[in-house]
Amino acid sequence: FYEPRQKHWAMTERRARDLQTSSSMLKIGPSSMSFDGESLTVDLDERSAPFRRAIRGKVVIDIPAHTDRCYALHSAGEHRWWPIAPTARVKVSLDAPSVRWEGAGYVDTNGGTVALEDTFTDWHWSRADMGPENCRIVYEAHARDGETCLMTLFGGPKTGMASEHSPPRRDLSVGPIWRVSRPARSYQGFNVEKTLEDTPFYT
């Protein structure tokens, strides 16, 4: 969660015994995620890194419709990506920190039989809202064997996602602290208004 003067980031390692799953629920430690067929509800009870501030509250993502297609990221078939809800509505209600917000959102998932870093040297993703029910997504990944995955999709959960010609490469400036490259694609070009995350592995 990003606020004007601070951010709240949690990525807590848990033991296998802390995991519970069912067809509609995922629980890891004190936090859980459940789906009722139309809404994904996330109940959070975590601590941020590195200062251990509380992150506690609820996030509800309305998903009245979803896409039904997964995309292969490599010809070997070991990796797939599914833009489940290219457009969605999100409601954030946190007690700690005190945050209330509603707006546009997105849900996707990556899956595979081997780790992403075993196959790919890097991967890049961007998404732009194109109205209340549509968006445009660019997904690009470069494999260690020289293969490249590049796809540009337009649409939404009700109409599905249609392939488009990919925009030309127009890289963002490198990250301000760790200097990680930020490849991107756009017809118009762009400026960096704010860098939300700048780490050695994700910028």
Language model region names:
Residues 1-203:
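Structured soluble/peripheral alpha/beta segments that form catalytic or ligand/cofactor-binding pockets
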